[in-house]
């Protein structure tokens, strides 16, 4: 986290960057926790440090993070659908974040090939937290071949006859 902080400050000073993206949170380490084995406390420190850095530099910092395995164990209509509580290793991530978006492709969790085919290419960006706005879901198109998501609202529709 110290190296990240120094690098972000340098980039802001030299190049006036307006956004920092961290891929991904669980790869970072906190020097004050080296040698200790409480990863949740360490992730909480890192999360708070990133939040403080964003405020200091007055820029948004987008942080990618892994989820735990809980979504895979869910059944019924919400099978696989991620929730805030699924953020891996710390509840502090959801506390510190201004916005939490979770990507979900229902087809990934289906066993039936026919159901899978019906949902192929469909995804959702679940806005699970938004400090200054509404939560909900944004329908997306998943382009797996190029690892890209697009807003489904802009898909071309066939004209009705």
Regions found by a protein language model. Name each.
Residues 25:
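Conserved Walker B
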Residues 28-29, 70:
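Catalytic P-loop NTPase motifs of RecA-like helicase/translocase cores
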Residues 1-19, 34, 48-58, 69-161:
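C-terminal regions of RecA-like/P-loop NTPase motor modules
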Residues 29-36:
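Conserved ATPase-coupling elements of RecA-like P-loop NTPase cores
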Residues 42-47:
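…and closely analogous acidic/polar surface helices at protein-protein or active-site interfaces
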Residues 64-66:
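Conserved H-loop
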